[in-house]
Structures are given as structure tokens and as C-alpha cells.
């Protein structure tokens, strides 16, 4: 496999990042060696070494003395709403290997005005689900709140149950209604953790966090889900073209 654009090492880094985000390369997996990278991508060993150094600098890989370079994501990788939607639709799993979620609440509630506008709800009520996602070593990696139109409470009653929905909510909604989430729009900003967010993430109130708001839409562009999530500092968000 050859690379046409420069700088070559960034192209290889991007290819490996895509495999890490998708879960093809999991935490603890061995990365291709310098020699293997050089042969696979037709690059020099010096360039291949730069690939390893870049992934280590970004916290996505680690190497111990005398050992191979391995994937390291439990404390460094922030998976976006788009990443999780892609995983749910392609594999039936919304969480990465080793991750698990705890649903802390599921009920009908009055949504904030910005959520109501996006959902197009006029009833004053919507389904609200709150969850905290943990890594395999039980560290919180994000806390999120998802909102759905109140009419989905009847067609997808699992939304009002404080339990994980196997395969994720997008798959459950598609199975019940035929509406498939095909895209997500996401906006992010740096913020200071509120007291509630700090308690969920295990950080100090006022600590820097990444705040994201996302919207899942179907093929007609209609909103299926509106969400807001918060993640602690020090986790890398990987963008894929």
C-alpha cells in the first residue's frame, strides 16, 4: 500500500487512528512494528518511527522497555456521538470494548428550550435518559443526557427503563419505528464542570471539561435524538474525514 499525499507519517497516523476509534484496534492490542509499517506503507523506518512517536505523544499508544508498542485508549480517547452511532449501526454495539454504561435516570421530563426546539415538541414533555460511561478500569469517561420525543415512550417503552438498551437506542428506535439515524450533528466547547457534572465524572467542580451537544437525524433530516455530554480533560477527540 502506497501513500500519495504528504506528509506520509500523518497519513499513516490517520489510518491507525481510524482503526483505534472504530475498535478494530483495541486497548492493549499490538501496533504494527516500525519494520511492518515501513513495508506496508512504503515509507522509511525513520518515518515509521515518527508514526509511533506521534501516537504516543497523543496518548493513543504506549511502549514499555523491551516490549512492543500497544494501543492505549482507556484514559485518553474521547469517542464522539458520530463514533458511537457508526459503531451501533455497523456492529450493533454502541460502546467500545471494555466500556460499560450505567443508566442513572429514565423518565418523562420537561426539556430545556433548546432541546424542545430541536425535537419540535409542543407537549412540554420528552423522554430524558441520563447515563455515565465507564472504562474497563471503572473510571468515568463521560456523562450524558439524551432526549427523545414523548411519543417514543409508547413505541419504545425501553426508553423509560433504567437499564441499558442492547445495541443502543438508535437501533431500538429503528426496530420499533423504521426510522434510522443516518447522521449526527455535533457542537463542542470547553467548559467548567458544574457540581453535578463534577460528581458524575469524579473531578473537582470548576475543572475543565469538554461539553458536547449532538443531534441524531433520519434520512428525511428529522430529529430522532438530542443529547448533551461532558467528558473530563485529558482525553483526545479523533477526527476522521
From Swiss-Prot:
Residues 34-53 bind DNA. Keywords: DNA-binding, Plasmid, Repressor, Transcription, Transcription regulation. GO terms for biological process: negative regulation of DNA-templated transcription. It comes from the Bacteria. PROSITE patterns: HTH_GNTR. One of its GO terms (molecular function) is DNA-binding transcription factor activity. Residues 6-74 form the HTH gntR-type domain. Controls plasmid transfer and prevents the lethal effects of the tra/kilA gene. Repressor for the transcription of certain pIJ101 promoters, including those the from kilA and kilB loci. This is Protein KorA. It comes from Streptomyces lividans. The lineage of its organism: Bacteria, Bacillati, Actinomycetota, Actinomycetes, Kitasatosporales. The gene is korA.
Amino acid at each position: 500500500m502506497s501513500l500519495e499525499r504528504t506528509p506520509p507519517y500523518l497519513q499513516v497516523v490517520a489510518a491507525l487512528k481510524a482503526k483505534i476509534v472504530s475498535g478494530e484496534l483495541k486497548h492493549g492490542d499490538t501496533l504494527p512494528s516500525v519494520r511492518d509499517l515501513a513495508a506496508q506503507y512504503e515509507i522509511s523506518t525513520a518515518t515509521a518511527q515518527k508514526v509511533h512517536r506521534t501516537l504516543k505523544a497523543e496518548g493513543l499508544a504506549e511502549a514499555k522497555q523491551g516490549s512492543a508498542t500497544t494501543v492505549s485508549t482507556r484514559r485518553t480517547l474521547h469517542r464522539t456521538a458520530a463514533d458511537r452511532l457508526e459503531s451501533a449501526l455497523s456492529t450493533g454495539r454502541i460502546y467500545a470494548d471494555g466500556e460499560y454504561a450505567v443508566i442513572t435516570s429514565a423518565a418523562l421530563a420537561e426539556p430545556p428550550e433548546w432541546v424542545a426546539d430541536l425535537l419540535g415538541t409542543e407537549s412540554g414533555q420528552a423522554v430524558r435518559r441520563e447515563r455515565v460511561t465507564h472504562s474497563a478500569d471503572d473510571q468515568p469517561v463521560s456523562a450524558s443526557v439524551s432526549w427523545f420525543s414523548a411519543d417514543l415512550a409508547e413505541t419504545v417503552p425501553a426508553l423509560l427503563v433504567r437499564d441499558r438498551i442492547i445495541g443502543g437506542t438508535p437501533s431500538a428506535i429503528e426496530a420499533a419505528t423504521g426510522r434510522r439515524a443516518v447522521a449526527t450533528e455535533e457542537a463542542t466547547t470547553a467548559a467548567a464542570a458544574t457540581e453535578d457534572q463534577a460528581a458524575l465524572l469524579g473531578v473537582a467542580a470548576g475543572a475543565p471539561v469538554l461539553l458536547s451537544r449532538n443531534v441524531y437525524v433520519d434520512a428525511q433530516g428529522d430529529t430522532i435524538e438530542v443529547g448533551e455530554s461532558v467528558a473530563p480533560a485529558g482525553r483526545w477527540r479523533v477526527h476522521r474525514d
